[in-house]
Amino acid sequence: MAMLRTDLEFSMLPKLDSRPVRWRIADGLVAYEEAVVAMEREVAAIAEGGDELVWLVEHPPLYTAGTSANAGDLVQPDRFPVFATGRGGEYTYHGPGQRVAYVMLDLKRRRQDVRAFVAALEEVVIRTLDMMNVRGERREDRVGVWVRRPEKPMLADGTMAEDKIAALGIRLRKWVTFHGLSLNVDPNLDHFSGIVPCGISAYGVTSLVDLGLPVMMADVDIRLRAAFETVFGETVNEP
Protein backbone atom coordinates (compact mmCIF):
# COMPACT_ATOMS: atom_id res chain seq x y z
CA MET A 1 0.00 0.00 0.00
CA ALA A 2 1.39 3.41 -0.99
CA MET A 3 2.30 5.76 1.83
CA LEU A 4 0.14 8.84 2.36
CA ARG A 5 1.74 12.11 1.28
CA THR A 6 1.48 13.31 4.89
CA ASP A 7 3.68 10.37 5.94
CA LEU A 8 6.39 10.94 3.35
CA GLU A 9 9.75 12.43 4.27
CA PHE A 10 9.50 16.01 3.00
CA SER A 11 13.20 16.80 2.90
CA MET A 12 14.60 17.00 -0.63
CA LEU A 13 18.02 18.34 0.32
CA PRO A 14 20.70 17.98 -2.34
CA LYS A 15 23.73 15.76 -2.24
CA LEU A 16 26.79 17.26 -0.61
CA ASP A 17 28.54 18.27 -3.83
CA SER A 18 25.56 20.18 -5.28
CA ARG A 19 25.66 23.93 -5.82
CA PRO A 20 23.02 26.33 -4.42
CA VAL A 21 19.77 26.74 -6.35
CA ARG A 22 19.60 29.97 -8.33
CA TRP A 23 16.78 32.26 -7.14
CA ARG A 24 15.27 34.56 -9.77
CA ILE A 25 12.40 37.04 -9.38
CA ALA A 26 10.91 38.46 -12.58
CA ASP A 27 10.02 42.13 -12.88
CA GLY A 28 6.51 42.92 -14.09
CA LEU A 29 4.18 40.45 -15.78
CA VAL A 30 5.70 37.60 -17.80
CA ALA A 31 3.88 36.30 -20.88
CA TYR A 32 3.08 32.60 -20.47
CA GLU A 33 4.61 31.67 -23.83
CA GLU A 34 7.83 33.41 -22.81
CA ALA A 35 7.90 31.52 -19.52
CA VAL A 36 7.48 28.14 -21.23
CA VAL A 37 10.31 28.85 -23.68
CA ALA A 38 12.57 29.95 -20.83
CA MET A 39 11.72 26.87 -18.76
CA GLU A 40 12.47 24.55 -21.67
CA ARG A 41 15.86 26.20 -22.11
CA GLU A 42 16.68 26.02 -18.41
CA VAL A 43 15.57 22.40 -18.05
CA ALA A 44 17.82 21.36 -20.94
CA ALA A 45 20.78 23.12 -19.33
CA ILE A 46 20.09 21.61 -15.89
CA ALA A 47 19.85 18.12 -17.40
CA GLU A 48 23.36 18.68 -18.75
CA GLY A 49 24.70 19.63 -15.33
CA GLY A 50 23.75 23.31 -15.07
CA ASP A 51 22.70 24.96 -11.86
CA GLU A 52 19.13 24.44 -10.68
CA LEU A 53 16.66 27.33 -10.65
CA VAL A 54 13.55 28.66 -8.93
CA TRP A 55 11.92 31.42 -10.98
CA LEU A 56 9.21 33.57 -9.40
CA VAL A 57 6.81 35.27 -11.81
CA GLU A 58 3.40 36.85 -12.18
CA HIS A 59 1.41 36.34 -15.38
CA PRO A 60 -1.27 38.39 -17.10
CA PRO A 61 -4.72 36.75 -16.70
CA LEU A 62 -4.86 33.34 -18.41
CA TYR A 63 -5.99 29.75 -17.99
CA THR A 64 -3.79 26.69 -18.43
CA ALA A 65 -4.91 23.13 -19.09
CA GLY A 66 -2.94 20.26 -17.62
CA THR A 67 -2.73 16.76 -19.02
CA SER A 68 -5.87 15.66 -17.12
CA ALA A 69 -8.02 18.67 -18.07
CA ASN A 70 -11.69 18.04 -18.87
CA ALA A 71 -12.98 20.35 -21.61
CA GLY A 72 -16.23 20.82 -19.68
CA ASP A 73 -14.31 22.47 -16.84
CA LEU A 74 -13.47 25.43 -19.08
CA VAL A 75 -16.65 27.35 -18.29
CA GLN A 76 -15.78 30.61 -20.07
CA PRO A 77 -13.40 29.74 -22.92
CA ASP A 78 -13.37 33.26 -24.34
CA ARG A 79 -12.70 35.12 -21.11
CA PHE A 80 -8.89 34.86 -21.07
CA PRO A 81 -6.27 33.17 -23.26
CA VAL A 82 -6.11 29.40 -22.73
CA PHE A 83 -2.87 27.43 -23.00
CA ALA A 84 -2.44 23.68 -23.20
CA THR A 85 0.54 22.63 -21.12
CA GLY A 86 2.37 19.41 -20.43
CA ARG A 87 2.19 19.70 -16.65
CA GLY A 88 0.07 17.36 -14.59
CA GLY A 89 -3.34 18.40 -13.32
CA GLU A 90 -6.39 20.08 -14.81
CA TYR A 91 -7.42 23.70 -15.45
CA THR A 92 -5.97 26.50 -13.36
CA TYR A 93 -5.85 30.27 -13.46
CA HIS A 94 -2.79 32.53 -13.38
CA GLY A 95 -2.88 36.28 -13.08
CA PRO A 96 -1.60 39.40 -11.32
CA GLY A 97 -1.45 39.05 -7.55
CA GLN A 98 -0.65 35.35 -7.73
CA ARG A 99 2.90 34.19 -7.08
CA VAL A 100 3.92 31.49 -9.50
CA ALA A 101 7.09 29.59 -8.64
CA TYR A 102 8.62 27.61 -11.48
CA VAL A 103 10.78 25.00 -9.76
CA MET A 104 13.50 23.47 -11.92
CA LEU A 105 15.44 20.90 -9.93
CA ASP A 106 17.38 17.78 -10.90
CA LEU A 107 15.95 14.99 -8.76
CA LYS A 108 18.97 12.83 -9.57
CA ARG A 109 20.89 15.21 -7.32
CA ARG A 110 18.27 14.81 -4.58
CA ARG A 111 15.72 11.96 -4.42
CA GLN A 112 14.19 10.31 -7.47
CA ASP A 113 10.74 10.20 -5.92
CA VAL A 114 7.98 12.17 -7.67
CA ARG A 115 5.38 11.76 -4.91
CA ALA A 116 7.88 12.97 -2.33
CA PHE A 117 8.68 15.95 -4.55
CA VAL A 118 4.99 16.91 -4.77
CA ALA A 119 4.67 16.56 -0.99
CA ALA A 120 7.80 18.70 -0.59
CA LEU A 121 6.32 21.49 -2.72
CA GLU A 122 3.17 21.37 -0.62
CA GLU A 123 5.34 21.54 2.48
CA VAL A 124 7.07 24.68 1.20
CA VAL A 125 3.69 26.38 0.87
CA ILE A 126 2.50 25.10 4.26
CA ARG A 127 5.63 26.44 5.97
CA THR A 128 5.34 29.75 4.10
CA LEU A 129 1.77 30.16 5.32
CA ASP A 130 2.73 29.16 8.85
CA MET A 131 5.14 32.11 8.97
CA MET A 132 2.08 34.32 8.44
CA ASN A 133 -0.06 32.48 11.02
CA VAL A 134 -2.17 30.78 8.36
CA ARG A 135 -2.73 27.04 8.66
CA GLY A 136 -2.40 25.39 5.28
CA GLU A 137 -3.19 21.70 4.95
CA ARG A 138 -2.77 18.96 2.36
CA ARG A 139 -5.49 16.51 1.40
CA GLU A 140 -4.72 13.01 0.12
CA ASP A 141 -7.43 13.15 -2.54
CA ARG A 142 -6.67 16.71 -3.67
CA VAL A 143 -3.19 17.94 -4.58
CA GLY A 144 -2.45 21.47 -3.42
CA VAL A 145 -2.76 23.40 -0.17
CA TRP A 146 -6.09 24.09 1.51
CA VAL A 147 -7.40 26.42 4.22
CA ARG A 148 -10.37 25.61 6.44
CA ARG A 149 -13.15 28.24 6.45
CA PRO A 150 -15.26 27.74 9.60
CA GLU A 151 -17.02 31.06 8.98
CA LYS A 152 -18.56 29.72 5.76
CA PRO A 153 -21.61 27.42 5.52
CA MET A 154 -20.91 23.72 5.96
CA LEU A 155 -20.65 21.58 2.84
CA ALA A 156 -23.53 19.35 1.73
CA ASP A 157 -21.89 16.33 3.35
CA GLY A 158 -21.69 18.13 6.69
CA THR A 159 -17.95 18.79 6.62
CA MET A 160 -16.30 22.16 7.10
CA ALA A 161 -15.86 24.42 4.07
CA GLU A 162 -12.35 24.59 2.65
CA ASP A 163 -10.77 26.86 0.06
CA LYS A 164 -7.71 26.24 -2.07
CA ILE A 165 -4.93 28.76 -1.60
CA ALA A 166 -2.17 27.09 -3.64
CA ALA A 167 -2.15 24.85 -6.70
CA LEU A 168 0.56 22.48 -7.93
CA GLY A 169 1.32 21.08 -11.34
CA ILE A 170 4.63 19.57 -12.37
CA ARG A 171 6.36 17.91 -15.27
CA LEU A 172 9.64 15.98 -15.43
CA ARG A 173 12.15 15.52 -18.20
CA LYS A 174 15.22 13.39 -17.56
CA TRP A 175 14.37 13.72 -13.85
CA VAL A 176 14.49 17.51 -14.06
CA THR A 177 11.32 19.13 -12.74
CA PHE A 178 9.55 22.12 -14.22
CA HIS A 179 6.32 24.06 -13.85
CA GLY A 180 5.66 24.12 -10.08
CA LEU A 181 3.25 25.95 -7.79
CA SER A 182 1.02 29.01 -7.59
CA LEU A 183 0.16 30.77 -4.33
CA ASN A 184 -2.74 33.21 -4.21
CA VAL A 185 -1.55 36.43 -2.58
CA ASP A 186 -4.04 38.99 -3.90
CA PRO A 187 -5.41 37.89 -7.29
CA ASN A 188 -8.88 38.76 -8.54
CA LEU A 189 -10.69 35.69 -7.22
CA ASP A 190 -13.59 36.24 -9.62
CA HIS A 191 -11.22 35.27 -12.44
CA PHE A 192 -11.31 31.68 -11.18
CA SER A 193 -15.03 31.51 -12.04
CA GLY A 194 -14.21 30.95 -15.72
CA ILE A 195 -13.02 27.42 -14.92
CA VAL A 196 -13.64 24.61 -12.48
CA PRO A 197 -10.27 24.97 -10.73
CA CYS A 198 -8.37 21.69 -10.83
CA GLY A 199 -11.64 19.95 -11.72
CA ILE A 200 -12.99 20.32 -8.17
CA SER A 201 -16.34 22.09 -7.90
CA ALA A 202 -17.15 21.44 -4.23
CA TYR A 203 -14.53 23.82 -2.87
CA GLY A 204 -13.70 27.47 -3.42
CA VAL A 205 -10.49 29.44 -3.78
CA THR A 206 -9.00 32.00 -1.44
CA SER A 207 -5.96 34.23 -1.08
CA LEU A 208 -3.90 35.71 1.70
CA VAL A 209 -5.64 39.06 1.32
CA ASP A 210 -9.04 37.34 1.23
CA LEU A 211 -8.11 35.76 4.58
CA GLY A 212 -7.47 39.22 6.01
CA LEU A 213 -3.70 39.51 5.61
CA PRO A 214 -2.72 42.81 3.91
CA VAL A 215 0.57 41.39 2.65
CA MET A 216 2.73 42.52 -0.25
CA MET A 217 4.24 40.14 -2.78
CA ALA A 218 7.76 40.96 -1.59
CA ASP A 219 6.81 39.92 1.96
CA VAL A 220 5.53 36.60 0.69
CA ASP A 221 8.65 36.06 -1.42
CA ILE A 222 10.91 36.40 1.62
CA ARG A 223 8.96 33.75 3.50
CA LEU A 224 8.65 31.51 0.45
CA ARG A 225 12.41 31.51 0.02
CA ALA A 226 13.03 30.75 3.69
CA ALA A 227 10.55 27.87 3.57
CA PHE A 228 12.05 26.54 0.33
CA GLU A 229 15.51 26.44 1.88
CA THR A 230 14.32 24.33 4.82
CA VAL A 231 13.04 21.69 2.40
CA PHE A 232 15.32 21.91 -0.65
CA GLY A 233 18.49 23.56 0.61
CA GLU A 234 20.52 26.68 -0.02
CA THR A 235 19.64 29.27 -2.65
CA VAL A 236 21.67 32.08 -4.17
CA ASN A 237 20.52 35.26 -5.89
CA GLU A 238 20.98 35.06 -9.62
CA PRO A 239 23.63 37.59 -10.73
Swiss-Prot record:
Pfam families: LplA-B_cat. This is Octanoyltransferase. The record marks 164 as: Lowers pKa of active site Cys. The lineage of its organism: Bacteria, Pseudomonadati, Pseudomonadota, Alphaproteobacteria, Hyphomicrobiales. PROSITE patterns: BPL_LPL_CATALYTIC (PS51733), LIPB (PS01313). CDD domains: LipB. The active site is at 198 (acyl-thioester intermediate). Its EC number is 2.3.1.181. Transmembrane segments: none annotated. PANTHER family: LIPOYLTRANSFERASE 2, MITOCHONDRIAL-RELATED, OCTANOYLTRANSFERASE. It is an enzyme of class 2 (transferase). It is found in: Cytoplasm. The gene is lipB. Substrate binds at residues 87-94, 167-169, 180-182. InterPro entries: aa-tRNA-synth_II/BPL/LPL (IPR045864), BPL_LPL_catalytic (IPR004143), Octanoyltransferase (IPR000544), Octanoyltransferase_CS (IPR020605). Belongs to the LipB family. It catalyses: octanoyl-[ACP] + L-lysyl-[protein] = N(6)-octanoyl-L-lysyl-[protein] + holo-[ACP] + H(+).
